[in-house]
Amino acid sequence: MAPQNMPAVSIDINMFWQIINFLILMFFFKKYFQKPIAKVLDARKEKIANDLKQAEIDKEMAAKANGEAQGIVKSAKTEANEMLLRAEKKADERKETILKEANTQREKMLKSAEVEIEKMKEQARKELQLEVTDLAVKLAEKMINEKVDAKIGANLLDQFIGEVGEEK
């Protein structure tokens, strides 16, 4: 039970003045600070929104740049592979050309050697023919000088053939 002298609800005078001061403070705050603070908050909100938009744009640009970079890398790899294939093809063509030139030169050398061999054979035939002719003349001279009978003529002929065989 409450004491009899005291009212059931009591308001302290200090509390009353604190409420009045608070209301006055709220009035001044609303009148002088609400608009500048609202402007600062709106500016901050707008800046954050712009930063988010810019971040999204930057992200899209980075993704686009990454895609372009990958395309460039892929293109460079393709071009490098094509260059490598062209270089290999040129090397193969050069190899074939060198082989053909070597074969052609070899064929020329073989033909030249064959021609030279034929010339040497012909020269040897001519020399042999001259020697045979010379020997035949010598044989005929011997036969005439000795007045040969048939037996001696056969022996001289065999001897002549033996000499020709040895000289070859």
From Swiss-Prot:
GO biological process terms on file: sodium ion transport
Listed InterPro entries: ATP_synth_B-like_membr_sf, ATP_synth_b/b'su_bac/chlpt, ATP_synth_F0_bsu_bac, ATP_synthase_B_chain
What single Pfam family name could you report for this chain, choosing any that match?
ATP-synt_B
Which residues are listed as membrane-spanning?
A: 9-29
Report membrane topology.
Single-pass membrane protein
User: Which UniProt keywords are given for this protein, alphabetically ordered?
Assistant: ATP synthesis, Cell inner membrane, Cell membrane, CF(0), Hydrogen ion transport, Ion transport, Membrane, Sodium, Sodium transport, Transmembrane, Transmembrane helix, Transport
Sample GO molecular function, one term:
proton-transporting ATPase activity, rotational mechanism
What does UniProt give as GO cellular component? Answer: plasma membrane; proton-transporting ATP synthase complex
Q: What are the subcellular locations of this protein?
A: Cell inner membrane
Anything else the record notes? The ATPase of P.modestum is of special interest because it uses sodium ions instead of protons as the physiological coupling ion.
Q: Which PANTHER family match?
A: ATP SYNTHASE SUBUNIT B (PTHR33445:SF1), ATP SYNTHASE SUBUNIT B', CHLOROPLASTIC (PTHR33445)
**Similarity comment: family membership:** Belongs to the ATPase B chain family.
Under the subunit heading, UniProt states:
F-type ATPases have 2 components, F(1) - the catalytic core - and F(0) - the membrane proton channel. F(1) has five subunits: alpha(3), beta(3), gamma(1), delta(1), epsilon(1). F(0) has three main subunits: a(1), b(2) and c(10-14). The alpha and beta chains form an alternating ring which encloses part of the gamma chain. F(1) is attached to F(0) by a central stalk formed by the gamma and epsilon chains, while a peripheral stalk is formed by the delta and b chains.
Role played: F(1)F(0) ATP synthase produces ATP from ADP in the presence of a proton or sodium gradient. F-type ATPases consist of two structural domains, F(1) containing the extramembraneous catalytic core and F(0) containing the membrane proton channel, linked together by a central stalk and a peripheral stalk. During catalysis, ATP synthesis in the catalytic domain of F(1) is coupled via a rotary mechanism of the central stalk subunits to proton translocation. Component of the F(0) channel, it forms part of the peripheral stalk, linking F(1) to F(0).
This chain's protein is named ATP synthase subunit b, sodium ion specific
Give the species this sequence originates from: Propionigenium modestum
